[in-house]
Amino acid sequence: MHANYLDTLDWGILIAYFLILIGIGIWASLKRKKGSSLFLAERSLKWYHIGFSMWGTNVGPSMLIASASAGFTTGIVSGNYAWYAFVFICLLAFVFAPRYLGARITTLPEFMGRRFGQSTRNILAWYTIVTILISWLALTLFAGGILIRQVFDIPMWQSALILLVISAFFTMAGGLKAVAYTNVFQMLLLIFVSATLTIAGLYKVGGVSALAEAVPADYWNLFRPNDDPAFPWLPIILGYPIMGVWFWCTDQSMVQPVLAAKNLKEGQMGANFTGWLKILDVPLYILPGIICLALYPGLKNPDEAYMTMVTNLFPVGMVGLVLAVLTAALISTVGSALNALSTVFTMDIYVKKFRPLASQKEIIRTGHVVTMAGALISVIITIAIDSIKGLNLFNVFQSVLGFIAPPMAAVFLFGIFWKRTTTMAANMALTFGTAFSMGVGILYLWVFPAEKYTAWPHFMMLSFYLFVVISAGMILVSLLDKRRQECTLNMKKVMEKPAKSVILAWTLLTIIMIGLYLFFNGH
């Protein structure tokens, strides 16, 4: 699919959509009253802004394309990444958010700095920056660049630059509030487009019953046998929690909207709303891939499942809208990541280490410079990723997360739940533990790829094993460390009893999720 396949109406919709986005960005920037809104939106975000922002950051074009591909090849089992997540979003709401908001922090490295000291904060700040550059910016730009390259037939570096310029505009012009407001607009369109695609596909295939008969029975099973090569149940049960804790509870890009919550209740309800939105991931993003298998079983490249459905089922004009929405979702992810990158570097490195008396104007200017520098570095990494051949997009994404997650998950969990954890243990986990985890990941993905060396366990089991090793190391070091210090952040003082409405909302979500898992049991 190239640009010459787009009708005049498609082009009109694309242009109109981006004009609307620019208007929203300008409006949000004019509403900004002080520089701090660049980072935490003046701590004024409501629950719906938080929910849409977290979901929008999570669901980019890369995940749309990859999820449809996973649905085409394995069914809804990949939906565990969406539905199992509610457990860890709940953990964010009731365990992490009260401490984050009570401490009035700007970044997560700042929180760990109060727990373990300045050395840990410095290490974690650099760790977070590297994580954002690789897992959020480069991988997202790579997947989005594939889409743009297919449509406009331009090189990857040009695709990445175009998308970065648009994303950087919202990050620098309106700060997090611009991203939050555009997320609401984008996600409503995303729901509409994806729901329309699913309904149109179900209509053409002959309904739900016809679809169920057209694909293998195990396509409706959330848990597969442990000898399944793609998604065995044990790695999902043991390995995903490591990624879940890191991704939903400790990743700056995901947690940033919660840090900007008006109060704890808004933050907890925003996280709950994210959990409800995650239910939509399966019918909106995975189900189209299953429908594509029923309608076009001869499709050779599963990564083309989503756009195959779009080009075959949607009329002229709708194709342009789909491209606009996918690009908008990419802008949401990249914009949030650029904002998080700027926040961490500026507040945790520049102000803390180099310019503690910097003015607000200087802080904002530094944030803009960091945003541009991060954008350029991410383009270079994207080009490097583009040179890698033969790797499945969905598995690459989940594998990278699986190898990044163990050190961070261990440090945050032990830092909160075990007071005897020492600074030395945390620092060793973040340095040696990270090097060990990343080293195993490089061996698994590139040096001795699992597709050729079948002795490797599933990458999610590797994530679990790495977490166990790092955790054991932290326990051992903490017990042997004679320089044990008291926690500098009094956890009890930052706790607040959840509102009844929050408890009710989470109870209802839990009941629904249990029901979904009981229903999709493969029978």
Identify what each model region corresponds to.
Residues 1-523:
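Membrane-embedded helix-loop-helix hairpins and adjacent transmembrane boundary segments
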